[in-house]
Amino acid sequence: MPRSKPYHHGNLRECLLAAGVEMIAEAGPSGFNLREVARRAGVSHNAPYRHFRDKEELLAEVAAQGFRELNAAMLEDAATESTPLGKLKRAGYAYVAFALRRPEHFAAMFDAPALDTNPACNQAGAEAFATLVGFITLCQQEGQMPEGETEGKTLFAWSLVHGIAKLAVTNRLPFRSPDRILQFAISAIDSSIKSLRDAN
């Protein structure tokens, strides 16, 4: 079983977060506790409270990390395309790829309880959603998608890629290969975008 290395002076917070990610990988957000995080980090059981009020705050920071990385991945992948629809497709692809690459963060982002009361986590999540809204808006402005109901169209697109990502990380798809999952995601994204373009 991999374990976090004992922390060095000045990086306790990062070490605790890394240990928290380990725990989520093994037991999920519901099996998370600060005492075990401290043990894995090689510090006293009181040490985590120097940086986090409780386990929910540490979980929220893991989730916020995930939302920030997801947002950056969507923007980076979208930048490889020149058309609004191409950018939207790549953002959707990046969403599923992120979940495959960071399943522990994905679990913290969407399965951990009581994160909606954490301002940093809420802000990071809102910024990621705003990125998707921006791509839908750009498609509408450039005439590649009907105008109106921007938020509804964004929720539709998000629901699709989130559903694929969730099925993938919980091994509910009939295939497990990351390449096959991403191929399926691309096909599903193409179909969903066609339906959005054809909507009146």
Role assignments for model-derived ranges:
Residues 64-88, 123-124, 137-138:
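Amphipathic alpha-helical linker/stalk segments
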Residues 1-11, 81, 197-200:
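N-terminal intrinsically disordered/low-complexity leader segments
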Residues 100-116, 166-174:
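Amphipathic alpha-helical segments used for helix-helix packing
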Residues 61, 75-105, 154-157:
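Hydrophobic alpha-helical connector segments
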Residues 15, 19, 23-57, 61:
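Helix-turn-helix
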Residues 138, 158-176, 191-200:
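Amphipathic C-terminal alpha-helical segment
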Residues 12-21, 37, 62-66, 70, ...:
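Generic hydrophobic, amphipathic alpha-helix propensity
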Residues 117-142, 151-156, 183-191:
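Amphipathic alpha-helical packing segments from all-alpha helical-bundle domains
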